Each structure stands twice: as C-alpha cells, then as structure tokens.
Amino acid sequence: MADILKRIEAYKRQEIAQAKQSVSLDALRRQCESVEKPRGFIKALAAKQAEGRMALIAEIKKASPSKGLIRADFDPPALARAYEEGGAACLSVLTDTPSFQGSPEFLTIARQAVSLPALRKDFLFDPYQVFEARAWGADCILIIMACVDDELAGALRDAARELGMDCLVEVHDEAELIRALRLETPLIGINNRDLRTFNVSLETSERLAAKIPDDRMIVGESGIFTAQDCARLKAHRIGTVLVGESLMREQDVTAATRRLLDLPPEAVTGPVHAVLES
C-alpha cells in the first residue's frame, strides 16, 4: 500500500505543479470569492441526526483502481438528484482522474443540480487544492491521515477554515486517530479498509469509535451495504456513513438509497436551505 500511496502522491504533485502554472493561487482566491458561499456540510449531517436518522454522505464515483468501471451510465447531476430524493444528507464526488476517472466538472455540476453540500473526494497534498475545491463548489475537503504528515494536515485544515469549509479527517488505525484528534476538527471518518491487507471489516469502526471523544462526529466508511450495517454502526455512536460503490451499482439509485437508510419508498426530500444557511 505504501508503494500505491507514493505513486498517487507523485502524480498528484505533478498535477498540482501544472495547475499552479495555469492558475495562480491569487487567481484561485478570486474565483473562490465569486462562487456561492459554502453550504454547511456538518450542519447538514447534524440535521439528519437530529431527526433520529442515519446521515448519509452519498458518493458519486465512476470507477476505482481495484474494481475498474463501476457505473457506465454515469450522469453526475442525475445521480445527485437521485441521492437527494433518496434522503442523503451530503454528496461526495471523486475529482481524481488517473485512479477514479473523476473530474472537477463532476463536482461542480452535481452540486449545482441539488441543494446538498458536497465533499471533494481526492488526495490532497497542497493547500492550493483546497482553494481549487472551493472554486469548483466544494463545501468540505478530505484529509487522509495515511497520506500526509501532521504539518501538511494542519495546513489543509487551516486553508479550509479560511474558506469557511468543513473537513472530513480520515483514519484507518489508532496511530492515525491520535494524530487526527490533535487537529481538533469536528468530523472524523473511520475507513474500515485495512491498508495492509485490503480486508474490510466494520469492527474497525466499532473499535476506533470507542476512542473518539463525544464532541466529535464520526463517519463510517467502506464495507457498508445494508440498513443492518447502518444500525450496527449507529449502536456504536456512528451517526454518519459514506457509501458509494454499492449504490453506484444499482439501477434505481433513489430506491437503493432509501433501502440503505431504512426509509419508506415515497419521497423523503424536504426544505433544507433554511437549515444549511442558519
């Protein structure tokens, strides 16, 4: 896995260097000032939880390195609307192209199609990418502790705070969790995939959740397929899940989302702007 992460970092840093040559940081800052202000990502999750429901971060993902093409019929705005109608709280959109066939455009057009906040799902190695994310419309960024040292993690967090964005800080084990908690961010994601073996187990979330202070919001990631999985995590104080591949493979994404959230088949959408802007 270390070799994979090194390969990813190498091509991402090359991408960043090329992007900086095309668009300066000052120009990016000006772009950020001209876009709609961030929608409250954490607020949207908290609103679902306040209703006693599992909060879903629904992922728009075309492909992955291990599984190849996941969804051939790939229409980000339509998928975003299907997720919103299914009761999702937020979106996660892949913007990495080499490994996931993602695109910045997917993030922008998916978010424009709905009222949900959106996460830029990507490998971040430079605060410049945080400004990119905001310019593209993202409301939240991902900080993967396995990919960054503490100094870089702090710099990414600070850039997000400057822009009024939220951060999802992702951990895989106890050592990463200790480092993540030092960042003092409200949202901690536990990835159930073992980076050494690639095995996925919900026991990872259950084990690490017990070590997270009560004032943090916990997100379960990977290996979540059913309403029963959600209920299992909820019993361990995990009130949010991030799910992508299993929903992307469904023909009726809205119906699949409702089943995952244990919701009735009728529409579950409602006014959210007042909550997010409050």
UniProtKB/Swiss-Prot annotation:
This is Indole-3-glycerol phosphate synthase. It catalyses: 1-(2-carboxyphenylamino)-1-deoxy-D-ribulose 5-phosphate + H(+) = (1S,2R)-1-C-(indol-3-yl)glycerol 3-phosphate + CO2 + H2O. Its EC number is 4.1.1.48. It comes from Beijerinckia indica subsp. indica (strain ATCC 9039 / DSM 1715 / NCIMB 8712). Keywords: Amino-acid biosynthesis, Aromatic amino acid biosynthesis, Decarboxylase, Lyase, Tryptophan biosynthesis. Signal peptide: none annotated. It comes from the Bacteria. Pathway: Amino-acid biosynthesis; L-tryptophan biosynthesis; L-tryptophan from chorismate: step 4/5. The gene is trpC. One of its GO terms (biological process) is L-tryptophan biosynthetic process. Belongs to the TrpC family. CDD domains: IGPS (cd00331). PANTHER family: INDOLE-3-GLYCEROL-PHOSPHATE SYNTHASE, TRYPTOPHAN BIOSYNTHESIS PROTEIN. InterPro entries: Aldolase_TIM (IPR013785), Indole-3-glycerol_P_synth (IPR045186), Indole-3-glycerol_P_synth_dom (IPR013798), Indole-3-GlycerolPSynthase_CS (IPR001468), RibuloseP-bd_barrel (IPR011060).
